[in-house]
Amino acid sequence: MTKFFSHGKLLITGEYVVLDQALSLAIPTKKGQHMLIKEFAEEPRTLFWKSLGDDGNAWFEQKFLIQKKTKSNNNSVICDPNAQNKNEVAEMLVRILNKAISLNVDFLADKSYQVKTRLEFDRSWGLGSSSTLMCNIDKWAE
């Protein structure tokens, strides 16, 4: 099992303009987001994702398929076509994971995975549920 943790952040200045590449000031928080990854052998290769809130309840669950690399394309992640619960979160996660694959072609290359994330803070607080997720995925994909 592989574990990652990233601290949340409290933006002091530039809360919205930072998205347009403006300088901002932030301080890390004690609370953050955990990510646990279990690898296993399964065909077709799959990625089972479960996100827990600070209350321990699942707020997102999705099964993804990892498509094999071809001569012209890297591996890629897609939502399971049979999944009933595809949504914006799933589509955003697909984009993030595929970007990570484009930066490291060996990422998600040969196994199936079970990923569980857990926030230590309420998602509505604005402490960085997305940025801590991206940081954890970056660490995993290195």
Which residue ranges define each predicted feature?
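DPxDG-like acidic metal-binding loop motif
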Residues: W125-E142
